[in-house]
């Protein structure tokens, strides 16, 4: 089982891995929720660097308990976007997700500044997938497509499951996030996509995908 540690005093980063193994308790979503809310630390911020839908499901509860959320995780920003933004505004806390698009470049913040100054965003042009950009730059007569996918994962360009990138899901998530921040009411189903990988490659498990 996954381990977790909680402390109001913080941790010594020089040996936190050893401490986690020795003193960490078995972790669950309920444990994480209860420990963080129970600490009741003023002006606290929950930072999510995972790609977990389960962790993203905790945001609403945290925001309702006056805990700000900063997320690299894209899932909540396209699934429960309006609800979380509304709760954060009502509770006077922050729900921020700048790294969802552009790897931390101030794209979302810039859009917010433009909108708040009265501008209307009409068009955005961007390369939104570092993974696909990497793959298309690497593929050649000497390096087959399958190898470039593996290279992208080894170099940590891709999502843990590269099919999320290849299916266009990651790009669609980013497009929806940007459109919503620009003031448009958009859902994933509104985005047109043209796949360059056959649909049957997305069926089955991740292990099945790598065997093809």
List the model feature ranges, each with a label.
Residues 46-48, 72-73, 136-137, 164:
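A generic structural signal for short
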Residues 138-139, 147-212:
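Substrate-binding/catalytic subdomain of NAD(P)-dependent oxidoreductase enzymes
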Residues 89-92, 96-155, 169, 177:
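Rossmann-like NAD(P)H-binding beta-loop-alpha module
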Residues 69-70, 124:
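Hydrophobic residues within beta-strands of alpha/beta enzymes
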Residues 50-65, 72-114:
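Rossmann-fold NAD(P)-binding glycine/threonine-rich loop
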Residues 9-14, 110-113, 174:
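Short, surface-exposed amphipathic charged segments that create phosphate/polyanion-binding patches used
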Residues 1-64:
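N-terminal glycine-/serine-/threonine-rich beta1-alpha1-beta2 phosphate-ribose binding loop
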């Amino acid at each position: 089982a996954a381990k977790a540690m909680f402390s109001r005093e913080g941790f010594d980063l020089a040996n936190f891995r050893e401490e986690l193994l020795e003193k960490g308790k078995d972790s669950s979503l309920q444990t994480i929720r209860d420990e963080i809310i129970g600490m009741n630390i003023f002006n606290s911020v929950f930072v999510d660097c995972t790609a977990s839908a389960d962790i993203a499901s905790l945001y609403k509860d945290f925001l309702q308990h006056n805990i700000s959320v900063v997320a690299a995780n894209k899932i909540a920003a396209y699934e429960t976007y309006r609800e979380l933004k509304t709760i954060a505004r009502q509770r006077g806390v922050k729900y921020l997700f700048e790294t969802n698009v552009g790897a931390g470049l101030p794209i979302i913040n810039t859009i917010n500044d433009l909108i708040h100054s009265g501008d209307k965003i009409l068009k955005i042009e961007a390369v939104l997938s570092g993974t696909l950009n990497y793959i298309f730059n690497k593929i050649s007569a000497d390096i087959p497509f399958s190898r470039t996918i593996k290279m992208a994962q080894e170099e940590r360009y891709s999502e843990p499951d590269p099919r999320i990138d290849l299916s266009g899901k990651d790009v669609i998530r980013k497009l929806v996030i940007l459109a919503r921040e620009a003031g448009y009411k958009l859902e994933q189903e509104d985005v047109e996509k043209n796949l360059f990988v056959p649909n049957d490659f997305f069926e089955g498990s991740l292990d099945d995908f790598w065997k093809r």
